[in-house]
Amino acid sequence: MEPQRRKQNNWLGLMIGNSRLHWAQFVGKTLEKAWDTDHLSTIPNSQFPIPNSQSIYLASVVPEQTALWQAYTDVCVITLDQLPLEGVYPTLGIDRALAVLGAGEVWGLPVLVIDAGTALTFTGADANRRLVGGAILPGLRLQLNSLAQKTAALPKIELPDKLAPRFARNTPQAIQSGVIYTVLAGIKDFIQAWWQDFPESKIILTGGDRAILLSYLQTQFPEIGNHVITDPNIIFLGMRSVVSSY
């Protein structure tokens, strides 16, 4: 469906992520609530919580789910070319683009967004709302799960509430140490490199693992972690910027 050139009062934002559906309920420009659901295999029925058949503004990184939701009666798919963000490249993930757009709207530019989801991504924009670039690597849980799935003897391990010993003396903690400490070192390096170019920039942490990752950062590198801001809704705030322009 083509973008509707009318102002929306009540509308739903839907971000289709790699692991889940992320929803937001807007009344005008106000984000009333946000929630997550599992991916669906069919169009939702009357039991699914879409209030009053509202318009859905959708962004997606999962093509199969995009195709499913395009059959909904009132849906608009948000694409890169609709974003007021300069310097984007064709394969940039719409989630990353919306996140850095939303972070800039709320927290100011320049800004670096770290999204701790299935993938761990870094995305930065300068003061002119131009994409500087970023990086992608497997997220914390994906790294842990990959070791369990692709090796014969290593167990599936969960993220600990607190940092494991760096030099572990058992296999579960050794896996936690290897994954977590190398990710933290990488995050520190990226943030420090960003601050060299943009010393006044905010660092925004979002995504499903944002809280536990921030706690690790604040423990291991408090001089970094204590300056990181968490915001779970910046993708939806980026959507709001796009929808407001319709």
Question: What are these regions, as identified by a protein language model?
Answer:
Residues 1-29, 103, 110-131, 147, ...:
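Gly/Thr-rich phosphate-binding beta-strand-loop-beta motif of the actin/hexokinase/Hsp70
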Residues 1-85:
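N-terminal glycine/serine-rich phosphate-binding loop of ATP-dependent small-molecule kinases
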Residues 53-62, 198-209:
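Short glycine-rich phosphate-binding loop at a beta-alpha junction
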Residues 66-73, 214-224:
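Short, aromatic/basic amphipathic alpha-helical patches
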Residues 76, 81-150, 181-190, 226:
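Phosphate-binding/catalytic loop of phosphoryl-transfer enzymes
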Residues 97, 225-246:
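Glycine-rich phosphate-binding/hydrolytic loop that grips phosphoryl groups
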Residues 106-108, 194-199:
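Glycine-rich phosphate-binding loop signature in dinucleotide/nucleotide-binding domains
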Residues 137-197:
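Active-site rim beta-loop-alpha module in soluble metabolic enzymes
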